[in-house]
Amino acid sequence: MAAAGLAQIPDVDIDSDGVFKYVLIRVYAAPPSGDPAVETKEIVRGYKWAEYHADIYDKVSGEIQKKGYDCECLGGGRISHQSQDRKIHVYGYSMGYGRAQHSVSTEKIKAKYPDYEVTWADDGY
């Protein structure tokens, strides 16, 4: 049941164009009573409207908690999304949350955008 619920949360939700901040979030499903195992999944969220990485996490964590899940921010960075050229580049870090594991974020993004060139680097801010 928990895993089915987590599957309903999209792995990736990012703006369609531009350079913007993003966060990598781990979502926890509440385990059935008596079951010590907790189902988790990582999700990527990035939006142009966010002035700070925390703005994204605060909005998304509120939505996640309303659905009965818990979550934590694993880090952040920036995304350059060029939809015309079908390119996405993940880089940088968050001052508040630290650097996200861009390799994990990139794999999630590649799954959603299979016909894009998706790259990442640890440099830049």
UniProtKB/Swiss-Prot annotation:
Q: Where in the cell is it found?
A: Cytoplasm
Extract one GO BP annotation from the record: actin cytoskeleton organization
Chief location of this protein within or outside the cell: cytoplasm
Question: Which keywords label this protein?
Answer: Acetylation, Cytoplasm, Hydrolase, Protein phosphatase
Alphabetical GO CC annotations of the entry are: cytosol; leading edge of lamellipodium; nuclear body; plasma membrane
Keyword field contains Acetylation: yes
**What protein family is recorded?**
Belongs to the janus family.
**Assembly and oligomerization:** Monomer.
Q: What is this protein called?
A: 14 kDa phosphohistidine phosphatase
Gene, per the UniProt record = PHPT1
